[in-house]
Amino acid sequence: MTFLDMLRNATAQNQSMLCVGLDPEPSRFPAAMRGDASKIYDFCAAIVDATADLVNSFKPQIAYFAAHRAEDQLEKLMAHMRAVAPHVPIILDAKRGDIGSTAEQYAKEAFERYGADAVTLSPFMGFDSITPYLQYEGKGAFLLCRTSNPGGDDLQAQRLADLPGQPHLFEHVARLAQGPWNTNGQLGLVVGATRPQEIERVREFAPSLPLLIPGVGAQGGDAVATVKAARIGGGPIIINSSRAVLYASQGDDFAAAARTAAQATRQTLQDAAAA
């Protein structure tokens, strides 16, 4: 089954647009685990177990594991997610971007070592830095397009004077991803929830692509405006929440609190879709 098929099935089965991001920070763990990087797997597995029926995807952020020499725990977590939620796709948040020969190794890491269903990438180095990932049939690749961080304006909002209509860089990325780069229907886009009007603009260029949308929750994105904008064109929607779910409680009830937070976010997104 392809990543896109898995995403659509999980969205329907769990009635959810919610992605839970797995960004483990040991300093924020419950008291019994706090500061202990060897407990990263235990913490994340408990979150997965508590939310697996509420999400359409999980998104482990590789830096939060690598910084603590916890790649082995990430491998174990990937296997656990496969066992307890085989219908839920896993997006490895790596934001890789490098020349083709190096990209081949990053693709091997994402899809062979970790067994991810999709990966996040930077398109800055062009199509030949993306193609090694697309060699993995059925896997997904999300290109950074219009991100939620303030510094995204430095490059993404700049206009390309040499192209017809002088599009913004993020608009050009969306056009390429919808069109000539999407040779096997594997691409999606990362678009931040803090700029709903620009999600609408992205949808003009990429109506059918899946959108991975961080920024709802801790980053302050408006759920109703985000869902309304993302639904234009009918492409799949993945709305990520990380900290608001992971750290809903720093007590022993952290997993139950994470479930409650995920339920509330899923309901908010469902209400937004119905508005």
UniProtKB/Swiss-Prot annotation:
Keywords: Decarboxylase, Lyase, Pyrimidine biosynthesis. One of its GO terms (biological process) is 'de novo' pyrimidine nucleobase biosynthetic process. GO terms for molecular function: orotidine-5'-phosphate decarboxylase activity. PROSITE patterns: OMPDECASE. It comes from the Bacteria. The keyword Lyase applies. It is an enzyme of class 4 (lyase). Disulfide bonds: none annotated. It holds the Pfam family OMPdecase. It catalyses: orotidine 5'-phosphate + H(+) = UMP + CO2. The active site is at K95. The keyword Lyase applies. SMART domains: OMPdecase (SM00934). Pathway: Pyrimidine metabolism; UMP biosynthesis via de novo pathway; UMP from orotate: step 2/2. HAMAP family: OMPdecase_type2. PANTHER family: OROTIDINE 5'-PHOSPHATE DECARBOXYLASE. Belongs to the OMP decarboxylase family. Type 2 subfamily. This is Orotidine 5'-phosphate decarboxylase. It comes from Delftia acidovorans (strain DSM 14801 / SPH-1).
